[in-house]
Amino acid sequence: MAFINIGFFSKTLGMEVTCDVILPQPVHPENAQDELPVLWLLHGAYGNYADWMRRTSIERYVANTGLCVVMPSAQNSDYTDMAHGGRFYTYISSELPERMRSFFPLSQRREDNYICGLSMGGAGAFKIGLSKPDHYAAIGCLSAGAQNKGGRLIRMMGSLIYGDTPCEGT
């Protein structure tokens, strides 16, 4: 298994971004797959790309599965194209998969792609997975809180992220 920390310039965000990648090492190289199945693993609020490697056993969990794991950073964006900030939904759902596939032999087939996240990342995985059902075979939401109702701080963060225009049906 290879563990790679990769940085590149995101055109969508207009800044340098970082993510961790776990690449499987084939037990029998002569039987290696041409394209790897991939898990897009999203961090929670106040976290970053390194949380999964530093605070979980993700590397042990995916050992011998042949699964690539991509763990990007999305700041505290709620995986949304912010009204007053970065376009993190577009970055995570479109640019990141394209860039990772240009670096590594990752499958584009729906049945080989999975998206999962914790807390804010779980809500982001749910949002991205449901908005792009033709891209993901499964969605994992771990402790996701998808509503933004609450106190003044929650309303202020919601306004900064989503803008002041209310959305119908929310």
PLM-predicted stretches and their roles:
Residues M1-T170:
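Non-catalytic cap/lid and distal C-terminal segments of serine-dependent acyl enzymes
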